[in-house]
Amino acid sequence: MAQQSQRPISNRHISLLNRNGLILLLLLALFVILGVFLPLTKSSLFMFPNTTSSSLSPSSSLSVSDWRDYSLAQAVKFVAKNETVIVCAVSYPFLPFLNNWLISISRQKHQEKVLVIAEDYATLYKVNEKWPGHAVLIPPALDPQSAHKFGSQGFFNLTSRRPQHLLNILELGYNVMYNDVDMVWLQDPFDYLQGSYDAYFMDDMIAIKPLNHSHDLPPLSRSGVTYVCSCMIFLRSTDGGKLLMKTWVEEIQAQPWNNTQAKKPHDQPAFNRALHKTANQVKVYLLPQSAFPSGGLYFRNETWVNETRGKHVIVHNNYIIGYDKKMKRFQDFSLWLVDDHALESPLGKLEIYQEQNTTTEGKNLTKIVRKQRKNRGKKHKLP
């Protein structure tokens, strides 16, 4: 009787072992599956939360053809933060200036919302190699060597595409800040975008204004022009912002390139005309000169710089022509950050000149950089 009563218990143990063993095997298999596939999917979702399985996910492993297919809509969705993006348009020779600008933006914690509009494929691949997803090319690609020469047709072709790029972003539903890359951020410009205006911009004048100057659109001068700079613009995705960009596009199209003109056309006069044509329909805000000075004021008027110490937000290296001259002036004023602070940029250290040594322009740029690094000249102290 005792033996018979123990058999069911023994059988029950065996049954439980078999069942538990099966469960353990299933759990082990599940852990193996999760261990292999979950990190891949999780890292993809963590790094690129704005992408979907049906869209192109930015990744350093993407092929050249993939980056060619990367669209503006995908790029803006990837980089946007709080429905806002910061954009610039860059050709390959100006990558060092892009890196310098990015370092200054990184110091203000806004680098992740930056989108580089590459004007040539070399720029597209280089930026996305270092910083996947943060560069997009909107065809057609431009000649990288002629696009950086101020006053050239290549430069005009580059800048004349700008309002259409900005309009496209606005129509996607995003606010956008545009910067030229020969700028340096010293403070956070978003702190100065007060109110609910459609467009914010900076003056390009060297004449000193009072600290409490008007923030309205400047009136036309006696010659019928104003000097608002198209180098730094913030636009909200409003009907007014879109209208301003559409009008700017129309004004540029009305002044096609003509090499015989005494003053070759560029985008800034067209922007000023667009501002005045839409003055009754677009709410605009002129940023304070003390915070957003032109290069003609900041680099040439030491007295004014000292009087406005601590107020400067973005410095524009304009009122000077030439790649090497711009770099030299940044170096003289301790605003060339690339040599000593490259690791603060999302792009890190860029080795780009060796790739251009097969061209005459590439060799010239290499000589410029070597010369500037060897002889920095006397440095001015920042106020």
Curated annotation (Swiss-Prot):
Broad class of the protein's primary localization: Golgi
Co-factor(s): Mn(2+); Mg(2+)
Protein family membership: Belongs to the glycosyltransferase 77 family.
PANTHER family cross-referenced by the UniProt entry: UDP-D-XYLOSE:L-FUCOSE ALPHA-1,3-D-XYLOSYLTRANSFERASE 3 (PTHR47032:SF2), UDP-D-XYLOSE:L-FUCOSE ALPHA-1,3-D-XYLOSYLTRANSFERASE-RELATED (PTHR47032)
Keywords in alphabetical order: Cell wall biogenesis/degradation, Glycoprotein, Glycosyltransferase, Golgi apparatus, Membrane, Signal-anchor, Transferase, Transmembrane, Transmembrane helix
Cytoplasmic membrane side: 1-20
Protein name: UDP-D-xylose:L-fucose alpha-1,3-D-xylosyltransferase 3
Gene name tied to this protein: RGXT3
Tissue expression: Expressed around trichome support cells in the adaxial epidermis of rosette leaves, in cauline leaves, petals and both the proximal and distal ends of siliques.
Lineage: Eukaryota, Viridiplantae, Streptophyta, Embryophyta, Tracheophyta
Pfam families named in the record: Nucleotid_trans (PF03407)
Glycosylation site residues: N50, N82, N157, N212, N258, N301, N306, N357, N364
